[in-house]
Amino acid sequence: MSGRPLAAVARPLLLLPLVLFTMTALAPSASAHPLGNFTVNSFSGLRVEPQAVNVDLVVDSAEIPTVQQFPQADSPGGVTAEQAADYAARECNALRPGLRLTLDGTREELTVRSSDLQFLPGQAGLSIMRLSCELRTIGTVDTVGKDLEYVDENSLDRLGWREITATGDGVALVDSDAAARSISGRLTEYPQDLLTSPLDQRSASMRVAPGDGTV
């Protein structure tokens, strides 16, 4: 059995009804997350090089998931820089296995190169959090002349925005079904006309060819 105190485990659950009541009461005058207070939204930006693939992963969590994870985020003292850095490192490593990258059907493992966690103002005086993970394939990986497939298997049970982009850096991406530019600004500016029907792209495929750019 875990040695974590029962009160520490139960606190987020006990706070949730109060949080929901506060958000409902203040909703008309507060700025809510554009996709809803329960959403967990993700963006993967692929940058393909001749001998490596980089993944820029961003996870944007709305107010409810944030307060469940960090009930102290909006209390005096809040979340310390050390706590934020520790969570970011652990969470990026936990998400890494769910990012499936293959070249000609062979899976290429990713390693986390950097991680960051930021808290931003949300609705009713609560925070939302933005997790950023920079990942890269391990060692030298020849990409040219191969079919690349990428699948984000994380958060399959969550509501939210899912977006993947892909660009070539010293290579050309042929028949890519991923856009070259993020239409949400990496989850910072969601298009108003898509708020009721969020983008739900969890996979991308393309052919890597000699050149530079997307064909």
Role assignments for model-derived ranges:
Residues 8-11, 26-31:
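Intrinsic disorder/low-complexity segments
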